[in-house]
């Protein structure tokens, strides 16, 4: 790669109250959908994990639609959601946290674009990330000034993975909307947090992140939006993810070279001296190649970096502290390898980007 191979546009969020930044413009959404279809149709000679790109793309489409329908119908009526084999998918996503309106704005844009292009709107719940905070900042008025007060909705748990984190302190969790309302009464007469929190508490799940996302999704449907939600962790257990993972594992050395070269180019173009920004380069430890993936087992509270040793007949997967070692036989068919990767994730080992 060289510095001229990629051109970065300078994008800047607007500073005015009520302003928004949408790129590309919503008016061009249909043309972008058509361009993507044409681009993907040209990938006729690409094979990933023993499957053609076209077949893998169709498999991934089927998986995400099925998974999104199965997940969403546990708390919403999907009678009016119709999906056909030719339906396009428009996608967005975010961590299932108490995010600000600027993030929520994406979901309204998603719904508008889907209706404009007669597509299926899917919100990807980024639950493979970590819980960054269990509190929010609320404006509080004192005699002389307005300050920000931190109000916690829960305590921090031993595991900080969003997809597995449950409620740590029921009393703290249940009293959250009232404690926020007590601080906001000077500024907001009827905060929507109370009705939102009722949906949070009624959600048929023990995972806090899913409680937040399901409550948010129900509010959206009450406002006339029509979309599906699906946790990314669910897709990571599917066959299409496993097949992509197999392709990366088998080509670990080449993948690492391309990945690190892209980081170096980005740093040069933006004149970044911090070697860890935007992300660290992948390492090689002895004969083990690091991949941009996390792994954990039921016995490890924290996620660990994933490493792969590649031989002619097998792939050896392990984490940095060597809490596990898995051997994937390459003498069998790619489909059998995919089944083995899926089987590991159904038992004790998890792989996430």
Provide a role label for each language-model segment.
Residues 2-33, 37-38, 51-53, 109, ...:
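N-terminal, positively charged nucleic-acid-binding surface of large information/translation enzymes
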Residues 93-96, 124-129, 232-237:
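An acidic- and aromatic-residue-enriched active-site/binding cleft used to recognize and process polar
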Residues 97-100, 128-133, 300-303:
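Flexible loop/turn segments at secondary-structure boundaries
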Residues 210-329:
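Extended, H/D-rich, highly charged conserved domains that either
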């Amino acid at each position: 790669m060289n510095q001229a191979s990629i051109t970065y546009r300078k994008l800047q969020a607007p500073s005015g109250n009520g302003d928004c930044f949408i790129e590309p413009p919503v008016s061009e959404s249909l043309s972008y959908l058509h361009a993507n279809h044409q681009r993907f149709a040209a990938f006729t000679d690409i094979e990933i994990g023993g499957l053609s790109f076209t077949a893998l793309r169709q498999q991934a489409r089927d998986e995400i639609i099925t998974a999104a329908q199965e997940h969403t119908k546990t708390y919403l009526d999907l009678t009016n959601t119709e999906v056909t084999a030719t339906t396009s998918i428009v996608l967005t996503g975010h961590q299932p946290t108490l995010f600000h309106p600027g993030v929520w704005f994406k979901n309204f844009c998603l719904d508008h674009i889907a209706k404009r292009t007669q597509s299926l709107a899917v919100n990807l719940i980024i639950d493979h990330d970590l819980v960054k905070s269990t509190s929010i900042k609320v404006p509080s008025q004192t005699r002389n000034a307005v300050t920000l007060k931190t109000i916690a909705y829960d305590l921090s748990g031993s595991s900080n993975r969003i997809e597995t984190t449950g409620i740590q302190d029921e009393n703290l969790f249940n009293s959250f909307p009232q404690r926020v309302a007590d601080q906001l009464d000077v500024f907001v007469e009827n905060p929507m947090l109370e009705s939102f929190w009722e949906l949070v508490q009624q959600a048929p799940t023990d995972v806090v992140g899913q409680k937040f996302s399901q409550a948010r999704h129900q509010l959206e449907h009450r406002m006339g939006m029509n979309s599906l939600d699906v946790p990314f962790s669910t897709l990571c257990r599917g066959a299409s993810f496993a097949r992509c993972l197999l392709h990366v594992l088998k080509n670990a050395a080449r993948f690492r070279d391309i990945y690190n070269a892209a980081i170096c180019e980005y740093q040069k173009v933006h004149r970044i001296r911090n070697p860890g920004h935007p992300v660290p380069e992948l390492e090689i430890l002895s004969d083990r190649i690091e991949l941009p993936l996390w792994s954990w087992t039921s016995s490890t509270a924290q996620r660990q970096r994933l490493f792969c040793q590649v031989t002619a007949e097998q792939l050896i997967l392990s984490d940095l502290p060597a809490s596990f070692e898995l051997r994937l036989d390459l003498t069998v068919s790619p489909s059998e390898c995919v089944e083995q990767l899926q089987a590991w994730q159904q038992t004790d080992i998890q792989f996430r980007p």
